Amino acid sequence: MALVKVKPTSPGRRGMVKVVNADLYKGRPFAGLLEKKSKTAGRNNNGHITTRHIGGGHKQHYRVIDFKRTKDGIPAKVERIEYDPNRTANIALVLYADGERQYIIATKGMAVGDQLMNGSEAPIKSGNCLPIRNIPVGTIMHCVEMLPGKGAQMARTAGAGVVLMAREGVYAQVRLRSGEVRRVHIECRATVGEVGNAEHSLRKIGKAGAMRWRGVRPTVRGVVMNPVDHPHGGGEGKTAAGRHPVSPWGQQTKGKKTRRNKRTTSMIVSRRGKK
């Protein structure tokens, strides 16, 4: 995997940096693990915009990822590493000894032909999935469950990883990349190692059109809109917003806390540090 700086043959390619991985499979994805993915353009079932700056983009299939890894004791072999347009991490197609194929998140250093195992008897090896009670303290993990059997929810993006800090009774403490320390039940599963494709954060898109391919529409400032479109709009010539920054619907947009107290923080040991 390498970063390639593109030659400035046009204004759109000037400054563009691509991530090139010669090991990625160049054929079509495995058809048995594809599902239809419908585009919403950021609208809900009423047709109202619920998420701005979404629309268009290339057609995609959803790759069904096995986030639970519950096929215990059955060895699996990595058949190929693939690109997934739905996430920043690459994915691996694994073939289990019983003939079943599954997609999993590709781990850093994973290669075609690697042998993997799930379950409490699996060795501590990058790519193997075990309950946290069987993983040594200090191990870097990814694809960590928050509730036993629910499937991986934490550390799934490219280059992500959490550190197992300690075990106390039925709970373990893990430190996230943000610095937050959380409690997780020791029966929750996690995969050993870091997520691959860490260079993804170093790429440079280069042009607006490349973001349109990804389904991202332009972001327009409120101060250049008309008063009917945004609270910051209107005025003769260039004018300031005239009030504290708000969203198009009048909600404070800088610094206002929006967290609902209904969602418990009992599993958070220490919050992430200020950046």
UniProtKB/Swiss-Prot annotation:
> Any idea which UniProt keywords this protein has?
Ribonucleoprotein, Ribosomal protein, RNA-binding, rRNA-binding
The processes (GO biological process) annotated in the record are:
cytoplasmic translation
A GO cellular component annotation here is: large ribosomal subunit
Molecular-function GO term, any one: rRNA binding
Specify the superkingdom.
Bacteria
Q: Name one Pfam family in it.
A: Ribosomal_L2
Asked if the record carries the keyword Lipid biosynthesis, the reply is no
> Which intervals carry biased composition (Basic residues)?
254-263
**Span list, region Disordered:** 224-275
Query: Which segments of the protein form a coiled coil according to its record?
Result: none
This protein's assembly is summarised as: Part of the 50S ribosomal subunit. Forms a bridge to the 30S subunit in the 70S ribosome.
Query: What does the protein in this record do?
Result: One of the primary rRNA binding proteins. Required for association of the 30S and 50S subunits to form the 70S ribosome, for tRNA binding and peptide bond formation. It has been suggested to have peptidyltransferase activity; this is somewhat controversial. Makes several contacts with the 16S rRNA in the 70S ribosome.
Instruction: Tell me its family.
Output: Belongs to the universal ribosomal protein uL2 family.
Report the protein name in the record.
Answer: Large ribosomal subunit protein uL2
Specify the species. Herminiimonas arsenicoxydans
